[in-house]
UniProtKB/Swiss-Prot annotation:
One cellular component term from this protein's GO annotations in UniProt: plasma membrane
InterPro entries: Phos_transporter (IPR001204)
Protein name: Putative phosphate permease CPn_0680/CP_0067/CPj0680/CpB0707
Phylogenetic classification of the source organism: Bacteria, Pseudomonadati, Chlamydiota, Chlamydiia, Chlamydiales
GO MF, one annotated term: phosphate transmembrane transporter activity
Residues making up the signal peptide according to the UniProt record: none
Stated family: Belongs to the inorganic phosphate transporter (PiT) (TC 2.A.20) family.
Bilayer-spanning residue ranges: 1-21, 42-62, 87-107, 112-132, 137-157, 180-200, 207-227, 260-280, 313-333, 364-384, 399-419
Species name: Chlamydia pneumoniae (Chlamydophila pneumoniae)
């Protein structure tokens, strides 16, 4: 038993590492592509907020993947076979992610793990131990998530263009709107944090809601003060190399001075959104690596398994994700940030806000949606607002194709690893 437990923990760390190396690009890639963050800054921000997102909210999605796809108590499935199956699903996910990262394929982590769990469920019970209703709900969420992300991003960007960029004085319009946008981001994040999680131990009490409102008010006041300072509207003709203004001029040299002021304000808002996006992504996707580990430990040590065991596992997975991000994450971050479509801070803000709202809502509801689906949907929403020619359709085709390949690939690898593990440890 102990060798299997050690092996599944190693597989959990390995898969978390690959999630960090591959999937975190969805959180901070737009910020790098728009020039708001350097690659190093993006990695640091993502590492911090991904870890705390996994620790504070990841337990909800972990519960969905662990026990809501296959029947743990079904008499057709032996305890040992369930542990072999979950370990096989975990290993299949890690191997497929690493293979995809090697070839630069933008695959879905959630597709892989859910497909892998379904794969060993088909082998053990010929489909009878799988909760097909739960699988159907998950599939519906995968279909809805890109539309939700796209619609929200489209509405946000359309609002920005109509009420800021199309005005006679876009700087004055931005000064009026920016405090409300900042308050929206902060209040949304606060709402997510009080809505769930094992560690926070807070609920939607009047005090908690009041705290969120106070944070939103403070963000409004701080932003209001900033946009009325001289520093906000000052644009140096020779900005310091490496500074935010320098990067924005380098990425979009045809900006007029007024539009550069507006985009720089959006740049600061996009940093807030990037933090929110990383937090939401960590709360949703680390569960893909930890849920099978939790399932094995629950079967092996039912008496000693508690909610705090899951907390420690989420922290363990968060560490693996951070290490994978730091070592190999730069590859996919550059791909997502620079190759799908041309991004500016205002567009990146719209993409990030639409994606973050969708992913955070899914985590609260316990739906293991695909972050890739949400981000691609948000980018498509921005593209539709600007015109279809603004989108790199070849990249979109590759992403959509990967959605169809990943789920069966996860299932097939899981089946192969299941028989190998049962032969090795049985």
């Amino acid at each position: 038993m102990l060798p299997l437990i050690i092996f599944v923990l190693l597989c959990g760390f390995y898969t978390s590492w690959n999630i960090g190396a591959n999937d975190v690009a969805n959180a901070v890639g737009p910020s790098v592509g728009s020039g708001v963050l350097t690659l190093r800054q993006a990695v640091v921000i993502a590492a911090i907020f991904e870890f705390f997102g996994a620790l504070l909210l990841g337990d909800r999605v972990a519960g969905t993947i662990e026990s809501s796809i296959v029947s743990v108590t079904n008499p057709m499935i032996a305890s040992g076979d369930y542990m072999y199956g979950m370990t096989a699903a975990l290993l299949a996910t890690g191997v497929w992610l690493q293979l995809a990262s090697f070839f630069g394929w933008p695959v879905s982590t959630t597709h892989s793990i859910v497909g892998a769990v379904i794969g060993f469920g088909l082998v053990l019970g010929k489909g009878t131990i799988i909760y097909w209703n739960s699988v159907g709900i998950i599939l519906i969420s995968w279909i809805l998530s890109p539309f939700m992300g796209g619609c929200v991003a489209y509405l946000i960007f359309s609002f920005i263009r109509r009420h800021i960029f199309y005005k006679n004085d876009p700087v004055l319009a931005m000064v009026r709107v920016a405090p409300f946008l900042a308050a929206l981001v902060i209040m949304t994040l606060g709402t997510v944090m009080i809505s769930g999680g094992v560690i926070l131990k807070v609920s939607s009490t009047p005090w908690a809601v009041s705290g969120v409102l106070v944070c939103g008010l403070l963000s409004y006041i701080i932003t209001f003060y900033y946009v009325h300072t001289k520093h906000c509207s000052y644009i140096s003709d020779t900005p310091k190399k490496g500074s935010l203004t320098y990067r924005l001029k380098e990425r979009g040299g045809n900006y007029g001075r007024k539009y550069l002021v507006v985009e720089r304000i959006f740049a600061y808002l996009q940093i807030i959104v990037a933090c929110f996006m990383a937090f939401a992504h960590g709360s949703n996707d680390v569960a893909n690596a930890i849920a099978p580990v939790a399932g094995v430990l629950r079967q092996a040590y039912p008496a000693s398994y508690t909610s705090y065991t899951l907390i420690r596992l989420m922290a363990f997975g968060g560490i693996g994700l951070v290490i994978g991000l730091a070592i190999w994450g730069w590859r996919v971050i550059e791909t997502v940030g620079c190759k799908i479509t041309e991004l500016t801070p205002s567009r990146g803000f719209s993409v990030g806000m639409g994606s973050a709202l969708t992913i955070a809502l899914a985590s609260i509801l316990g739906l293991p949606i695909s972050t890739t689906h949400v981000v691609v949907g948000a980018v498509l929403g921005i593209g539709l607002a600007r015109g279809i020619r603004a989108i790199n359709l070849n990249i979109i085709k590759d992403i959509v194709l990967s959605w169809f390949i990943t789920l069966p690939a996860g299932a097939l690898l899981s089946i192969l690893f299941f028989f190998a593990l049962r032969a090795l440890f049985h």
